[in-house]
Amino acid sequence: MEENNDKFVLNSEKERKGKVKPVHIVDVPGHARLKPKLDEVLPKAAGVVFVVDAQDFLSSMQAAADYLYDTLTKASVVKKKVHVLIFCNKTDKVTAHSKEFIKKQLEKEINKFRESRNAISSAEISDEVNLGYLERLLKSVNARTR
């Protein structure tokens, strides 16, 4: 299991005159063994698409929330204000959970992580930034979905 890389030119870029800038996409699977690869590519990221399996969500909810929390609190993501899109895959399946359900469950799990990690002294937290950023981000997401 490894990440996939590709570069391509957007159709809108092809129509422009002058220098055409390709988009570089890196697909890093959510397996724990590949987390170091994510740390390697995040500082260069202009955006993150975090994919959640809507059909098999409950069995992977804690792991997904933990991975999302780690991604959202990385210094490189916070400092550069990297846009994060949470994408629910397999929503066309009959047994898939709704995006609203997934959003609420992820928020609950992330809040659990925040509370437990806030209890740890700041001296013990490594490579994490102010968790207030995460709170503002969640409020922003809530405001846009209402």
Language model: regions and residue ranges:
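Switch II (G3) loop of P-loop NTPases
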Residues: K17-P36
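Switch I (effector-binding) loop of TRAFAC-class P-loop GTPase G-domains
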Residues: M1-G18, L131-L134
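Inter-motif core of Ras-like GTPase G domains
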Residues: L34-F57, A65-V78, V84-F87
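Conserved GTP-binding G-domain of TRAFAC-class P-loop NTPases and closely related GTPase folds
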Residues: D66-R146
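Anionic-ligand binding region
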Residues: M61
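Conserved Walker B
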Residues: P29, A54-Q55, K90-T91
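Core residues of folded domains in eukaryotic genome-function proteins
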Residues: E2-D6, K19-H24, K44-V48, K80-V84, ...
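Catalytic P-loop NTPase motifs of RecA-like helicase/translocase cores
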Residues: A32, L58, V94
